A protein has these predicted regions:
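Terminal targeting signals and extreme-terminal segments of soluble enzymes
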Residues: 1-162
Length: 162
C-alpha cells in the first residue's frame, strides 16, 4: 500500500509557498493531506477593489488554489492538474483580517478531479464557496516541473510503501 511521504509534503509546502504567484498574493498553503488543503491569507490593500472590499479575483484565486491542492495528494507522482472550470459564489464582502480557506476533495478520478473550497474569516463566517473541476495531465504541469522552474534540486518521493 502506498502512503504519502511526510517529507515530500513538507518539501512541497516549502516549494509552492515560495512560488511567484503565491508571493504576489501573499497566500500560504499551510496544511496538505489526502483530500484536504488549508490556505491562509492576511488581507492587505493590494487585495482590495477600488471600493475598499476584497476583489473577486482574490476569492477566485484562493478557491482555485485550495481546490487544486486538495486533490494533489490523490494523483500519481508524474501527473499534474489543470483547472478546467471554476465556480465561485461570493457570499459576503470583507475588508480586513485573515482569510482561512479549506479545500476538500469531492472526487479524484483518473482523468477528472472535483474539489470544493470554503473561505472563512477568523470568526468562522462563510465568505465564499467554490467548486473546481481539474483535468489530470500525466507529464504536464507536474510537481517536478515546478521544482525545475524554481531552481530546486529535487523532492523526496511522493509516496512510500507501507
Amino acid at each position: 500500500m502506498q502512503n504519502l511521504n511526510p517529507e515530500h509534503i513538507k518539501a512541497v509546502l516549502e516549494l509552492i509557498n515560495r512560488g511567484p504567484f503565491f508571493s504576489l498574493l501573499s497566500m500560504e498553503v499551510c496544511e496538505l493531506r489526502k483530500g484536504y488543503s488549508k490556505v491562509v491569507l492576511d488581507l492587505e490593500n493590494k487585495h482590495l477593489n477600488p471600493f475598499g472590499g476584497i476583489h473577486g479575483g482574490v476569492y477566485s484565486s484562493l478557491i482555485d488554489t485550495a481546490a487544486y491542492w486538495a486533490v494533489y495528494c490523490d494523483v500519481e507522482e508524474d501527473a499534474g492538474l489543470i483547472s478546467l472550470d471554476l465556480k465561485v459564489d461570493n457570499l459576503a464582502p470583507v475588508k480586513e483580517g485573515r482569510l482561512i480557506v479549506e479545500g476538500k476533495k469531492i472526487k479524484a478520478g483518473r482523468n477528472i478531479c472535483i474539489a470544493e473550497a470554503l473561505i472563512f474569516n477568523r470568526q468562522s463566517k462563510l465568505l465564499a464557496h467554490g467548486i473546481s473541476k481539474q483535468m489530470v495531465t500525466p507529464g504536464l504541469q507536474t510537481i517536478n516541473q515546478a521544482v525545475s522552474a524554481m531552481g530546486y534540486e529535487s523532492l523526496p518521493p511522493k509516496f512510500i510503501n507501507d
